[in-house]
C-alpha cells in the first residue's frame, strides 16, 4: 500500500513538473512568434521609411535625410537577422549558434552606422552643408518618433522574456533610430526657422561614440541566452 502511495506521489510530482515545463515551452513559443512578427514589421516599416527618406533627401538635396534613410536600411538588415534567429528558437543548439552570430551582425550594423554618421557629419561641417527644407522629411521624422518608441518597448519585452541578448541589442538599435529621428527633425526645423546649418552635424557627432560602443560590445559579446 505504501509503495502504491509513493508511486502515486511521484507520478503527481512528475506530472506537475511536466505540465509546468509544457506551459513554459508554450509561453516561450508564443513570445518567439511575437518576436518574429515584430521583426517582420521592422523590415517592412524601415524598408518603406528608407525609400521615402532617400527619395526625399535626393529631391531636397539633404544629406541628413539620405543618411536617415541609410540608417533605416541598416535596421532592415538587423530585423532580418533577428527574424532568422527567431525562426530557430525551439532548437537550443541552433538558437545558441544563431544568437552569437546575430549579436555580431547587429554589432557590425552599429559600427557601420557610426562610421557613416561620422563621415557625413564631418563632411557637412567642412563643406558647411545643411539640410534643405523638406516637408516630407519633417512628416517622416514625426511619424518615426511615434512608431519607433512603441516598437522598441515591444522588442525589449520579448527580449527579456526569451533571454535574447540579440533581441535586446536590436531594441537598442531601434532606440537609436528614435534619436536619429529627433536629430533629423531638429536639424530640419532649426535650419528652416533659425538658419543654424551646423545644428544637425554637431548633434549627430555626439551620438557617434555611443553607437560605436554598442556595436563593439555586440561584436565582442560571447554569452547568450
Labelled PLM ranges:
Residues 1-20:
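N-terminal amphipathic/basic-hydrophobic helices that include classical n-h-c signal peptides
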